[in-house]
Each structure stands twice: as structure tokens, then as C-alpha cells.
Amino acid sequence: MTDTSVQSNTALDNDTTHFGFTTVAKDEKVTKVAEVFHSVAAKYDIMNDLMSGGVHRLWKRFTIDCSGARPGQRVLDLGGGTGDLTAKFSRIVGDQGHVILADINNSMLNVGRDKLRDNGIVGNVHYVQANAEELPFPDDYFDVITISFCLRNVTDKDKALRSMFRVLKPGGRLLVLEFSKPILDPLSKVYDAYSFHLLPKMGELVANDADSYRYLAESIRMHPDQATLEGMMKEAGFENTKYYNLTGGIVALHRGYKF
């Protein structure tokens, strides 16, 4: 696989960042990412199932299993979009617990709210439109924070990780589920062909939007690899960090604690 990923925010000045393979002003990236998710929100769940063959459900189940969430706890599902993880956490924490589904994109948040309410998930779930870089919550507030398939879209990942660290309770844990770098060369070649050729065509057919899914493929390539992201988490203050490669490293789950 050609390594197009100039890791994270390196090689960029303070006013620019990556939008896929393109260098843009930071404010422009925020706008462009918002446009992507406004466009795909209605078909997001369908495309997730098609793109992953349903395997995303197993990745999310593993994330839940690694969260250690218990009844009565506070959980933040950051960038939670259509609410898959929120639904599961709601059942775990119960009536005495509290789950916040937070997303910067109101279209995704509305889809998630409607889906969860249609499934009878009410009472212990609240919805907040929030920027991961400037979370509007008190210090030391959450027992568990998850951010699933979202961090790669964040403009300043280091700032977002510091913000998550601030609102996490001592003893709490952060879980970052995200596309990553395949660890097997043959898999990398197949994955490249799938991502850059088949994926945009699927987006065009199902969501009438090839460009957003082309951005998806590019954003995955520009996201920090497993070791780099672990280093960023440590730099933000997280300890006992560890990552798990899932499906040959196509996805990785990173875990870190605040002590």
C-alpha cells in the first residue's frame, strides 16, 4: 500500500490541515466534513452494513466488551452519529446511569435520536451537539468515553484527545474505534482497490454521493497509524494504553485510562 499518510498533523502549518488528500484551511475542513455527513446521514446505517458486510457490528460489540461499563455510570458516546453504541450503553447503565450521544453534526444527531426513540430507548439518553475539541462538560465527569469512526474527521486530534482526557473521571477509560492501517501487505492491496474503486461506486448507487465516500477512503489513509495514535493518547495524558488490531488492522481499537 502506498503510504500517503503524512501522519496526523505533521508537515502542516498551524492554519491548515488535511481534508482527505487535500490540504485546506482548518475552518474549511470543518465546513467540508459537515457537508459530507449532512449528505450521508440518511443512508449512513445502510452504507455501514454494505461497506463492512455487517462486521462493524462485531467491532462495536468488542468496543462495548472492552469498555467495562457498569450500571449507574455516565458514558459519553462522542461522534456517536446514529447511536449504535449509545443503544447498547443505555441498556448497560440502566435507569440510574446516563448516556450522552454527542455529535458535531446535527443531521447525524437527528437520525440517531429518531432511531433510538423509535426503538424505545428513552429516559437515560441525552443528545448534545458538541465539538470534540471543546467538549461542553465538567471536568472528571464521565466513567467511559467512546469515539467510534469519528476521530479521523476531527480537525485537531490532539486537542480533542486533551478535551476527552479533561472530562473523563480518574479511573475512567477512553476507547477509540477507528479505521487504521492493515498489518498484512496482501490485505493492504485488496483494501486499497476496494476503498478507492468500489467504495465510491457503492456510495453513488446507494447514497447518490460518490464524493463523500471517496473522502472516506482518503480520510482513512491520512489518519495516524496504530502506534502513532497510541503515542498521541499518551501525550494527551492517557496511561496503560493499548490497541487491538481488528480484521487484520483494517480497524483498530485503542484503549487508555486516566489515573
From Swiss-Prot:
Keywords: Menaquinone biosynthesis, Methyltransferase, S-adenosyl-L-methionine, Transferase, Ubiquinone biosynthesis
Enzymatic reactions: a 2-demethylmenaquinol + S-adenosyl-L-methionine = a menaquinol + S-adenosyl-L-homocysteine + H(+); a 2-methoxy-6-(all-trans-polyprenyl)benzene-1,4-diol + S-adenosyl-L-methionine = a 5-methoxy-2-methyl-3-(all-trans-polyprenyl)benzene-1,4-diol + S-adenosyl-L-homocysteine + H(+)
Record's keyword annotation contains S-adenosyl-L-methionine: yes
An example Gene Ontology biological process: menaquinone biosynthetic process
EC number(s) stated in the UniProt entry for this protein: 2.1.1.163, 2.1.1.201
Keyword Electron transport set for record: no
Protein family per UniProt: Belongs to the class I-like SAM-binding methyltransferase superfamily. MenG/UbiE family.
NCBIfam families in UniProt: MenG_MenH_UbiE (TIGR01934), PRK00216.1-1 (NF001240), PRK00216.1-5 (NF001244)
Protein name: Ubiquinone/menaquinone biosynthesis C-methyltransferase UbiE
Organism: Vibrio campbellii (strain ATCC BAA-1116)
Source species taxonomy: Bacteria, Pseudomonadati, Pseudomonadota, Gammaproteobacteria, Vibrionales
